[in-house]
């Protein structure tokens, strides 16, 4: 296994007021790591909980009280973390929602909180819901499942269509179904006394996409439904909870006074009450086949882990051996058998009833065990829904700062990695917890000082290729940053194959996954220092502009205005006015006030076309000299060229309705018509984008002499997904210091351009000045978005445009910058 990086946390104090230094961690589907530090901490004053102002690090430090602190960080910027909240109570549960946008915190004392980032800003968190189970200690929690699962089958990597590669989990149901079978959102809790609590999240209370300076946020108090998990209550020491395909939750726990028994229960939820009236949540708990252990000989259970491997229920039981003699890990699998029934006990007897010759029985069987040389800190199992056990691995995180990778069933050791060796000092740093990323490619580990370690997980026997993992992320919507951080080899060939496979999908499949595909491809191109974000913005502007078009006569239109425009442009007419005369102008009529509000977007479209044509001769020359082409170049993308031609025709028509919406340029001669020139050159480029003719290149070279070409805005944040970060990860193990941006990953490229010191809003295409007061910047790609977008938008078209940017196009979170 390869150690990717380590983040030293100098902010955390070496002396803790708690008897045990305990760090909980959890990784979301968006590759955001949440961890809790149950000790005194020194943190940046700008990253303070729900009252934080979101400033950049380095604005000052503040000493935190001896409380429980919760932080989050991105795996591509692990040195920079943000505070979620602090509490005087000890945190016992840390759990992400399935979509990675809500964080559940369970405390000793019975309080449960659900936090979420405000306006998708990773450094500004707000309390959304809370509930209380008085005089109880929360020891386990699980969000409701939506019943949508995808099987990862490495044997189908050669299939063409996504529907064949990634099958849906059959007969999987949500934890709680509402009206019409729609999955409900909520949580199930288990306390240390065996009390179950469940509550659903009201959908109407979700945070709107208002600006950061919008109305005050309202915290919703929820009343949970309570039910005892068993007939009697008892003190639970260790437990594990996992969803089952039937929609129920499987729970296994061990009690302190009954160490040789691991009890198993199935918990199901339902809504009781008449439809249309007030319904309440009902909890049903059923006892299942339990595990009866043999003589423990002084051992005590230290960990329980219930999971599903290849459609089988599996429980891992870890024991702490006496006198510090290491630990032991066992795997128990639930087997189902058909037992024959004696003829006298068989049912039936009627004319239509057949006797029951067999009855199904369940039992737990121990299939493997392994002796570990050190105490076990945590267990992690492959998070992918695999089809075969060969695609799954078990990770035993040991307190001697080592990790053992085990094979399921046989429990044979596949790999062993030793991190920093443990010293003999009593205050030595030890591994305490860990978790896998969504695609199970990176194992993240925290030690007792809340320092983060990242290691590349070894590929299993049927691990699949990097291409298959990336396509899996496209289909499931999971973040693919952990896959991109691996040593994928030839990125250009990977992008070409990924694009080729995507274009082979049916049109409705491409349309459904297009946003996920663009976000993934933009991250890959950013690692190759290639510009792909322009295509995403161009696609968003194109859909926004086309949504404004309405046919003049609904009764005699079998195609919309956008379809008719595409048909006319297929004839490759070089004159934009000729194309405009062949169209019905009434179909493109838009209110002049609305067109005025879209002027900055219109300016962006023509700026992109102008820059693309201006750089075309230089790009062609680079290709001839180097002998190889980049994996992506927008000037060779026929889809982008066609979208630009369509938008130029629409802009030409709208300019007749309102001249104030037309783009503005500084020209050397007054008789230059920019739209006519751009459309003519783009039409000629569309005929052969792979090899433009010499005459076209000559005309493109003259553009800089005819008008002033605006310089494109570049966003170059310091992340591991940049070209510098990708090269550093491939070179070997990296070491970072928390809250210190590594200089080795910074982009040192500087250009003397107009507005070089000015910040530009990438969404509105507006210059915000050198020091804007409130902006949002993407934590991954550096894209800038104004905070008060809802106040700027005066028309419905502009409001629809801003609503597209609730999330950044690259899949990252926003970061509030003051």
From Swiss-Prot:
Ranges for the WD repeats: 86-125, 296-342, 615-666
GO biological process: positive regulation of DNA-templated transcription; regulation of transcription by RNA polymerase II; regulation of transcription initiation by RNA polymerase II; response to heat; response to lipopolysaccharide
Pfam families xref list: Med16_bridge, Med16_C, Med16_N
GO molecular function: transcription coregulator activity
Compartments where located: Nucleus
Annotated keywords: Activator, Nucleus, Repeat, Transcription, Transcription regulation, WD repeat
InterPro entries the record matches: MED16_bridge (IPR048616), Mediator_Med16 (IPR048338), Mediator_Med16_C (IPR048339), Mediator_Med16_N (IPR021665), WD40/YVTN_repeat-like_dom_sf (IPR015943), WD40_repeat_dom_sf (IPR036322)
Family: Belongs to the Mediator complex subunit 16 family.
Subunit structure: Component of the Mediator complex. Interacts with Dif.
Official protein name in the record: Mediator of RNA polymerase II transcription subunit 16
Organism whose genome encodes this protein: Drosophila melanogaster
Taxonomic lineage from the root: Eukaryota, Metazoa, Ecdysozoa, Arthropoda, Hexapoda
């Amino acid at each position: 296994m390869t150690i990717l990086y380590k983040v030293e946390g100098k902010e955390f104090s070496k002396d803790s007021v708690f008897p045990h230094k305990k760090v909980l961690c959890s990784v979301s589907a968006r590759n955001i790591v949440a961890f809790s530090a149950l000790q005194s901490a020194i943190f940046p004053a700008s990253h303070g909980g729900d009252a934080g102002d979101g400033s950049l690090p380095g604005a000052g430090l503040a000493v935190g009280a001896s409380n429980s602190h919760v932080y989050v960080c991105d795996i591509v910027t692990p040195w920079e973390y943000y505070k979620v909240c602090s509490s005087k109570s000890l945190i016992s549960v840390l759990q992400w929602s399935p979509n990675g946008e809500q964080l559940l915190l369970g405390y000793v004392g019975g309080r449960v909180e659900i936090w979420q980032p405000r306006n998708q800003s990773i450094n500004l968190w707000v309390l959304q819901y809370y509930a209380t189970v008085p005089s109880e200690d929360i020891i386990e929690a699980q969000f409701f499942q939506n019943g949508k699962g995808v099987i990862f089958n490495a044997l189908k990597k050669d299939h063409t269509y996504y529907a064949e590669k990634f099958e849906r989990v059959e007969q999987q149901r949500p934890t709680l179904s509402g009206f019409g079978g729609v999955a409900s959102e909520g949580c199930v809790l288990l306390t240390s006394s065996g009390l179950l609590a469940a509550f659903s999240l009201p959908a109407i209370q979700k945070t709107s996409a208002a600006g950061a300076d919008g109305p005050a946020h309202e915290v919703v108090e929820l009343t949970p439904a309570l039910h005892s998990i068993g007939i009697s209550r008892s003190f639970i020491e260790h437990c594990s909870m996992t969803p089952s395909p039937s929609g129920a939750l499987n729970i296994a726990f061990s009690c302190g006074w009954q160490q040789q028994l691991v009890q198993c229960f199935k918990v199901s939820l339902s809504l009781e009450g008449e439809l249309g009236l007030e319904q309440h949540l009902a909890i049903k708990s059923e006892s299942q086949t339990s595990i009866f252990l043999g003589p423990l000989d002084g051992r005590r259970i230290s960990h329980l882990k219930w999971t599903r491997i290849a459609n089988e229920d599996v429980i891992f039981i870890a024991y702490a051996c006496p006198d510090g003699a290491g630990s032991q890990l066992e795997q128990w699998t639930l087997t189902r058998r058909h037992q024959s029934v004696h003829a006298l006990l068989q049912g039936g007897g009627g004319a239509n009833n057949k006797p029951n010759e067999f009855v199904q029985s369940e039992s737990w069987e121990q299939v493997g065990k392994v002796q570990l040389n050190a105490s076990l800190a945590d267990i992690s199992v492959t998070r992918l829904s695999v089809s075969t056990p060969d695609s799954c691995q078990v990770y035993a995180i040991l307190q001697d700062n080592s990790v053992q990778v085990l094979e399921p069933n046989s429990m044979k050791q596949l790999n062993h990695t030793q991190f920093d060796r443990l010293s003999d000092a009593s205050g030595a740093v030890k591994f305490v917890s860990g978790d896998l990323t969504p695609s199970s490619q990176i194992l993240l580990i925290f030690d007792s000082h809340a320092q983060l370690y990242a290691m590349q997980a070894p590929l299993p026997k049927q691990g699949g290729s990097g291409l298959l993992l990336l396509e899996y992320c496209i289909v499931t919507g999971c973040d693919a940053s952990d896959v991109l951080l691996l040593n994928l080899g030839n990125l250009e060939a990977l992008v070409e194959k990924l694009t080729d496979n995507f274009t082979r999908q049916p049109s409705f499949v491409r349309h459904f996954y297009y946003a996920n595909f663009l976000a993934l491809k933009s991250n890959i191109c950013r690692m190759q220092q290639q510009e792909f974000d322009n295509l995403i913005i161009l696609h968003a502007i194109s859909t926004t502009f086309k949504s404004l078009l309405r046919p003049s006569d609904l009764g005699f239109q079998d195609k919309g205005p956008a379809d008719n425009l595409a048909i006319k442009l297929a004839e490759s007419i070089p004159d934009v006015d000729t194309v405009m005369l062949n169209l019905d102008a009434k179909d493109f009529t838009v209110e002049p006030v609305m067109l005025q509000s879209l002027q900055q977007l219109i300016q962006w479209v023509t700026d992109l076309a102008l820059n693309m044509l201006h750089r075309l001769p230089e790009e062609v020359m680079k290709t001839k000299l180097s002998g190889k082409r980049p994996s992506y170049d927008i000037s060779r993308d026929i889809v982008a060229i066609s979208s630009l031609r369509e938008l130029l025709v629409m802009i030409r028509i709208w300019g007749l309705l309102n001249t104030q919406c037309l783009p503005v340029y500084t020209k050397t001669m007054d008789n230059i018509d920019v739209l006519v020139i751009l459309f003519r050159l783009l039409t000629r480029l569309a005929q052969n984008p792979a090899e433009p003719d010499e005459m076209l290149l000559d005309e493109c070279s003259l553009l800089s002499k005819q008008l002033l070409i605006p310089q494109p805005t570049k966003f170059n944040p310091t992340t591991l997904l940049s070209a510098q970060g990708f090269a550093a990860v491939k070179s070997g193990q990296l070491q970072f210091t928390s809250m210190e941006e590594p200089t080795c990953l910074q982009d040192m490229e500087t250009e003397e351009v107009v507005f070089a010191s000015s910040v530009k809003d990438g969404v509105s295409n507006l210059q915000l000045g050198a020091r804007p007061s409130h902006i949002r910047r993407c934590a991954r790609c550096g894209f800038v978005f104004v905070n008060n977008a809802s106040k700027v938008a005066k028309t419905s078209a502009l409001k629809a445009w801003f609503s597209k940017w609730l999330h950044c196009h690259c899949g990252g979170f926003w970061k509030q910058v003051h």
